Amino acid sequence: MYNLAHRILKKLDPELSHNISIKALKLGIYPKIICKNTEILEQTIWGRTFKTPIGLSAGFDKNAEVINPILNLGFSFTELGTVTPLPQKGNSKPRIHRFPAQKALINSLGFNNKGMDVFERNINNSNLKENFQDKIIGINIGNNKDTVEILDDLKKLFDRLYRLGDYIVINLSSPNTPGLRDNLKSQNFEKIVTNIHRLRDENNSKIPILFKISPDISDQDKKDISLISLANDVDGLILTNTTVNKSMVNEKLEGGVSGLSLIHI
């Protein structure tokens, strides 16, 4: 069954394949996998126990539409988003391109999502506390494309969503939002870190906050980010988003490359 579905989906447009997968999960067309918990795979981070190290990263379930089905597939955690305050269509299509020979994809999606109102409602409707008490939920947040001050959007998102997840991710790494990666420069990064931590304190919250970074930053930026993170007790960094280095796929398409290319960075 899986092999047949996989062959069919690979023949279709990549974004259409993704949308079909979401619809299939919504309809319950997937195998429910019963996993036996093995203590040797467990890891406790920030006081939260991850049953296994296998989870689903942000980008698949952008709108928190299929939380329960994803966790029923056996993942110990899922990261939802990236979500922005307002709905956003993203960049023009086609915006996902496959390169099977190179085991790579290029995407220029641009934070396409239905916005935080729909996102919040979907999480509340999933009854996570009743269905998956032992699972971990991450919430990945980012700014709208036309936002002038990124902290304004991050504040809106944090205030609305921090109670709904086990950890928050600040996405500063997408190459498909103009100017976003500039926030990884030391002065900008430190400003965001200190302001987000202050916002957490103002809400009397202890939720872990992670920052997702780019693979394309300079060695000096890597050093600066590391030192700033240590100095400010950052809970974690997520390495990494897609790269704009297209040497392995030899393409002039807009967007970021994921897949095998990242191993060599």
Regions inferred by a protein language model and the residue ranges of each:
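Conserved alpha/beta-domain cores
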Residues: 50, 58-61, 71, 112-129, ...
